[in-house]
Amino acid sequence: MQPPGAHATPPCADALVNAGLARVVAAMQDPNPDVSGRGLLRLMNAGIGVQCGVLESEARALNKGFLKRMETGQPYIRVKMAMSLDGRTAMASGESQWITGPEARSAVQRLRAQSSVVLTGADTVLADKARLTVRPDELGLNAELTALAAARPPLRVLIDGRLRVPLDAPFFQAGSALVVTCAAASARGRYQEEGHEMLALADSAGHVDLRKLMGELATRGVNEVLVEAGPRLAGAFARLGLVDEFQIFIAGKFLGSSARPLLDLPLAQMSEALELNIVQMRAVGNDWRVIALPVRAPGV
C-alpha cells in the first residue's frame, strides 16, 4: 500500500525520500480519505518514480478489514460456525463440546488471533462457559507469532440484552470485555468496577442494534469482527445482511434430528434462501473447513 503522508507519526513518505530511493512500487493507493494519494504525490514531487496498482487484488485480500472500514464505515464481519454433517451445532441440551477435532479448533484460535474483535452472545457464554480468549498453546504457530498473538489479544464483545451473564462467569473472569445491552444504564457502574465497559444500544424492537454496534466498532478502529455465536445471534447477523464471510467447520458425525440447527433463519420459500459462493473447501484434520461469501444482490 502507498506510504502514508499523515503526520501523527513521522510519515513513511519522508523516510523514503530521505533514503534517496529512485523508484517505489505500491500495490494500491491508501483508501483512508485523510491521507489518500498524498504519500505518492510526495514521492513524485521529490523526483522518485512511482508505480501503483501492482498486485492490487492480493493487497486488497490482505487488508480486507481495513479497506471495508475505510470504504463503508463498517468492519469486515466473519461468522464462524461448527456443525455436524447433518447441519447441527449442539445437542438439544445445549451440549456442543466438542463437535470438531483439535486441528479445527486450532484454526479457530488463529482466526481469533487475527481478528480485532471476537463477538459472542449470552446464550453461548452461558451454555458453554465460554471465555472466547486466544489460547496460545493451541495456535500451532512459531514462538515469535505466538508471542505476538498473546501480546495483542482481540477485544471480546458480549451481546447480552438482558444482562443474564453473571459477573463471576468465566467469560468475565478471563479479562476485560465490552458488554452491549438493552438494559438500563444504571448497571454500568457494576461492570466498570470489574474492569468492563457497557454500551446500551437498543433498536425499535427492544433488541441490541447490531448495525449500530458495527458502526460504533468501526469508529473505534476495528477492522475485523469474528462472530462466534449460537444460531439465534448468528442468524440475526445473516438476516440483517451484515455477514461478509462464513467460515464453517464440518465434522464427520451426525447429531440427530433433535439437535440444534446451524442458524435461526426461518424461511418459507426457496426464493428466500441465502445464496453463498463457496471460495474454499479443505480438510482440517478429520474435519472440513468451508469458506463461503454471501452472494449480494446487484447494487448492494
Outline where the language-model segments fall.
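Charged/polar, solvent-exposed surface patches and flexible loops
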Residues: N18, A61-K68, S106, R110, ...
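Short capping loops/turns at secondary-structure boundaries
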Residues: N32-S36, C52-L55, M70-Q74, Q97-G101
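Enzymes that bind and transform nitrogen-containing heteroaromatic metabolites
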Residues: G5, V25, S36-L41, Y76-V300
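Proteins enriched for Cys/Gly/acidic motifs involved in redox and nucleic-acid/cofactor modification
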Residues: L40, V54-S84
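Zn2+-dependent cytidine deaminase-like catalytic core
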Residues: M1-A59, A183-A185, A238
